């Protein structure tokens, strides 16, 4: 009789001990019911927002909205928490149309439906409008190799410009724990110490551009998918048709292999990167304004203007490989600590101090 009672008890939610569990949390391994999952998921993100002082009352916050699961859940969570905890924020949806036929045009329809559901003002800004190029045009010009370089640079600038048009003073994006762990791995594998230094920051852009925050920094992608599924949220699930050629895909596959062996690896990587201590010479360069467009950058001309110049001159395909090589060489020159091109960084914890050496 006692064994039967214990068996029945073990099948109950480990949080409320009342309802039957519907999932095992990837983040903690807890067997949890649907309502408790909603509660802990939302409470953890609220804690991240409050403990990191991401917002203050009266902020005008642009939510980067692509129509995908991350940005759709972000819109849901920001709307819900803003009302529940009276953040006092003015929220906006900001979508960037890169001009990818069969992908972005379809996902924008999802964003429009989200706008109607959440009753949040929506701004759509296109690459064509800003740069007179679409990503389809760029891929035709340069091919599939390196196209993510153009898209990443243009998208970051477009988000800032769109936020300014909305008179927003902050941007939030749906980057989750998996994304950040992947970025840490990418920067380690490339020996990109300046980017490694800032990629785990929950707020970026505070040096001049609009501050961007990541409320999902400690939120697993699998839990975001589960939240969207159980809440029956309307989101677009097709991957970008050019994404399979991105370098990030290799880091993602590597991370999945690691996670299969150690489920906590995602958070472990983030916490490890947070504890890195960098030498002074690895600091990011001083920011200034681009002499052509006025955008924040570290050179006289920002990368977006440089890429546009190459596109408009018909030399983008040739110069892309040159620029990428030059960027790698500059990174090596500014970050190498000896003549053997070895990058050194220190990781500290309360118990130990270790030195990690990454060779180019």
Curated annotation (Swiss-Prot):
Residues 327-360 are annotated as: Disordered. Plays a central role in 2-thiolation of mcm(5)S(2)U at tRNA wobble positions of tRNA(Lys), tRNA(Glu) and tRNA(Gln). Directly binds tRNAs and probably acts by catalyzing adenylation of tRNAs, an intermediate required for 2-thiolation. It is unclear whether it acts as a sulfurtransferase that transfers sulfur from thiocarboxylated urm1 onto the uridine of tRNAs at wobble position. Belongs to the TtcA family. CTU1/NCS6/ATPBD3 subfamily. One of its GO terms (molecular function) is tRNA binding. One of its GO terms (cellular component) is cytosolic tRNA wobble base thiouridylase complex. Residues 330-360 have a biased composition (Low complexity). The keyword Cytoplasm applies. The gene is ctu1. Its EC number is 2.7.7.-. This is Cytoplasmic tRNA 2-thiolation protein 1. The keyword Cytoplasm applies. One of its GO terms (biological process) is tRNA wobble uridine modification. Pathway: tRNA modification; 5-methoxycarbonylmethyl-2-thiouridine-tRNA biosynthesis. It holds the Pfam family ATP_bind_3. Its main location: cytoplasm. Keywords: Cytoplasm, RNA-binding, Transferase, tRNA processing, tRNA-binding. It is found in: Cytoplasm. SUPFAM superfamilies: Adenine nucleotide alpha hydrolases-like. PROSITE patterns: UPF0021 (PS01263). It is an enzyme of class 2 (transferase).
